[in-house]
Curated annotation (Swiss-Prot):
InterPro entries: ICAT_dom, ICAT_sf, LZIC. Keywords: Coiled coil. It comes from Xenopus tropicalis. This is Protein LZIC. Gene3D superfamilies: Beta-catenin-interacting ICAT (1.10.10.490). One of its GO terms (molecular function) is beta-catenin binding. Residues 3-63 form a coiled coil. PANTHER family: PROTEIN LZIC.
Length: 190
């Protein structure tokens, strides 16, 4: 008992991160295989995955209400789940890196996007969407953006930024996070 639950907390956090990774990978795989699936199959699979995310979010709410030592660590995961549920972010890979607070990997992905656009491997619309998501995630993680990135965000990321702002408003209060999560889950179920 000397650890006062520290090892259990670490194990729980690890299990939660693995489950979040699995769900985000499932969303990413679904998007990558979209062309191979018929419309109904795609929609049904996406709906099931979003339901699993909602259930995971409900579990996080229960854990957060009963174990205050995990609130800070789980808050980031919950925000990422809310962003996925509300579809503020369309790229599961970005959601995963944001949830794990990995600004270095987000910046690497940003460089890959720039390269892919230059060689013609990526269309302008998809580039704009993904770059906007990454820049917003970096900003929310407290990272400093270059003046060029700030300008890109102000020009292109209005809708994504507004949705994400809605999801992350009032994050200072655990009660507000839980209330917002409940609203997002209910909206998803409708």
């Amino acid at each position: 008992m000397a650890s006062r639950g520290k090892s259990e907390t670490i194990k729980l956090r690890q299990n939660l991160e693995e489950q979040l990774d699995r769900l985000m990978q499932q969303l990413q795989d679904l998007e990558e295989c979209r062309e191979e699936l018929d419309g109904d199959e795609y929609e049904e699979t996406k709906k099931e995955t979003l339901e699993q995310l909602s259930e995971f979010n409900d579990s996080l709410k229960k854990i957060m209400s009963g174990n205050m030592t995990l609130i800070d660590e789980l808050g980031g995961m919950q925000l990422a789940i809310q962003a996925a549920i509300s579809q503020a972010f369309k790229t599961p890979e970005v959601i995963r890196m944001f949830a794990k607070k990995q600004p270095g990997q987000l910046r690497t992905r940003l460089a890959e996007l720039d390269r892919d656009l230059m060689v013609g491997k990526l269309g302008r619309d998809l580039y704009t969407q993904q770059k906007g998501e990454i820049l917003i995630a970096l900003q929310k993680l407290g990272e400093k953006l270059s003046p060029e990135d700030e300008a890109f965000l102000s020009e292109n990321a209005g809708a994504v930024f507004n949705q994400f702002q809605k999801v992350s408003e009032g994050l200072g209060s655990g009660d507000k996070v839980l209330a917002l999560a409940s609203i997002e889950v209910e909206n998803t179920r409708k």
